Amino acid sequence: MKRFLKFLAVVLGCAALLLAAFVWIYAPIRARNLAAQYEQFRAEHQAEHDTIDTQFNQHDTVVNGLKWHYVEAGNPNGTVILFLHGLPEGWYSWRYVLPLVDQNYRLIAIDMKGYGRSDRTDTDYNWHTVASQTLDLMTSLGIDKFYVVSHDWGTIIGSVLVSDHPEHILGYVRMEADLIQRKNTGMISAYIQKPQWLLFQSKFIGSYMMGDPGWFINMVYTKRMTTPFNQPDRDYLVYEFSRPGVSEVVPEYFLQKNWDLNAAIGKICTTNFPFPVLQLQADSDPAQPKSIFADVATECRHVQMQWITNASQFDNFDQPQQVADAINRFIHAAK
């Protein structure tokens, strides 16, 4: 028995040394090498990146010390539609949708806090805080009431935004996110449903994975699209996600201390808001199969449900025309 305990102690000691070497030696070296690699990548792709940028009205502003980057399309005097992107995305996730949405509206697609060219200095990623800061951006632009269209993790913040500040919302289109909060869902159940949430509870693991944005974006997109992931789209997304600091702050969204699942999911289903809500969902998303929306008609009586066909998680890339058509019908009906 003593021999076994000594052996076990040696094994555990070696494992601890290997883990320490990985965390304190290998990971920092890898991070430096990747930073240099992606700095070169951005330099090599600067021209094509800038060419895409010229196709949209790019803007930067500072609100309460936070820098925000956003693009605009449509009528600058029209009713506003705010577009919120998910992970690992940016304003660019709406590139193919924006030109197809009614151009009589003022369309604003932002780089959400921590992403792309928006702020990465603030450390508070509580969902309510980020939602409030996003509203502050709109207020600074002279916008009081607006529609919200959100996708993936943008829907987390979008849902909190419309729940906390319904007086500013004209209508809400939420895409690619759970709608019905599972009964008696504790954190363990939530993690089983969404294992990536558990994985990214470790900021080290989240930053480690996102720190290689080319690999991370390839892994996420290619498995969750029904159409080919083309190279220009991939390169633009990698360029923006590889900006220094992004991989360090984006995992903050996943930390449990920042969560409020009821505001992000439950309240949307059960609340009769003074504005219409549309759940727009891809019909071929393995992470969110149709079965989890089977009870929407009975449990979420104030929410409209619509499917995007032949699309997966990134339906804004797979089927931008369907997405835009659904948005147009929704905003026209909400007038």
Residue ranges and their predicted role:
Residues 2, 47-50, 103:
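Compositionally biased, low-complexity segments enriched in small residues
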Residues 73-117:
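Conserved HGGG/HGGXW glycine-rich cap/lid loop of the alpha/beta-hydrolase fold
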Residues 95, 131, 321:
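Conserved active-site region of classical short-chain dehydrogenase/reductase
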Residues 311-320, 324:
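Catalytic histidine-centered segment of alpha/beta-hydrolase-like enzymes
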